[in-house]
Amino acid sequence: MARIASVNIPDNKRLVVSLTYIYGLGPAMAAEICNKAKISKDKKVKELTDQELISLRNIIESEYKVEGDLRREVTLNIKKKKDIRCYQGLRHIRKLPVRGQNTHSNARTRKGKAIAIAGKKKAVK
């Protein structure tokens, strides 16, 4: 397995698919990296030479924010929104959907497991 940006990428897959295993790289960005490195997208990772792997590493490290740096930036952005107490920050604090989704009938994933209201009984006449 080749190691790029501290991630083991699979050998038996095409280069474009393997690069998407790195957090922050999608299919379009992976294709762009292959073009910059002048490597065929259809080439398997196990067929790459050491020189090609080095060029891929250099391109990714110098031009793109991936893995730990990107995760850190995202968490800092969320923390900043929480600190200034803007609308999105408040939604993060309350663990509700941030981008305007409905919460009346959906949003179970974000809100967590449904909790029954204990002791609530219908009023008896």
From Swiss-Prot:
Coiled coil: none annotated. One of its GO terms (biological process) is translation. The keyword GTP-binding does not apply. Keywords: Ribonucleoprotein, Ribosomal protein, RNA-binding, rRNA-binding, tRNA-binding. It comes from the Bacteria. PROSITE patterns: RIBOSOMAL_S13_1 (PS00646), RIBOSOMAL_S13_2 (PS50159). GO terms for cellular component: cytosol; small ribosomal subunit. One of its GO terms (molecular function) is structural constituent of ribosome. Part of the 30S ribosomal subunit. Forms a loose heterodimer with protein S19. Forms two bridges to the 50S subunit in the 70S ribosome. Belongs to the universal ribosomal protein uS13 family. Located at the top of the head of the 30S subunit, it contacts several helices of the 16S rRNA. In the 70S ribosome it contacts the 23S rRNA (bridge B1a) and protein L5 of the 50S subunit (bridge B1b), connecting the 2 subunits; these bridges are implicated in subunit movement. Contacts the tRNAs in the A and P-sites. This is Small ribosomal subunit protein uS13. It comes from Rickettsia felis (strain ATCC VR-1525 / URRWXCal2) (Rickettsia azadi).
